[in-house]
Design a protein with these regions (language model features):
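Nucleic acid-binding interface residues in structured DNA/RNA-binding domains
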Residues: 1-107
Length: 107
């Protein structure tokens, strides 16, 4: 398991920055690849928001395991623009169309 919380946090930051444009990953996949327990997926947003240069982290590329995206009213317009620019289409329920082919698993 994890040696230190700081090491886990740094791994999450590093992995999040590797998600390529036009692809998404899930909170659970990100946590798993960083060596954390699945229940830690709930902490990802907080961990990422505390990263140095957190504006370099593509928050919009991290989604729920169902393919649904969270569109916070504060960032909705910006995120919808980013999805469009990256060729990621959403259905009327804010789920990624063709989610399985857009899913990035770090493999």
């Amino acid at each position: 398991m994890l040696n230190k919380p700081e090491e886990f946090t740094k791994r999450v930051w590093k992995l999040a920055r590797k998600i390529p444009k036009g692809r998404v990953t899930t909170y659970g996949i990100l946590v798993g690849m960083a060596g954390g327990h699945p229940m830690m997926a709930r902490m990802v947003t907080t961990i990422l928001s505390k990263a140095p240069n957190h504006n370099l982290i593509p928050f919009h590329r991290i989604v729920y395991s169902s393919g649904k995206v969270w569109l916070d009213p504060k960032y909705k317009t910006e995120r919808l623009k980013l999805y469009k620019e990256e060729g990621i289409k959403l259905d009327k329920n804010n789920k990624i169309v063709d989610f399985k082919n857009k899913l990035f698993t770090f493999e």
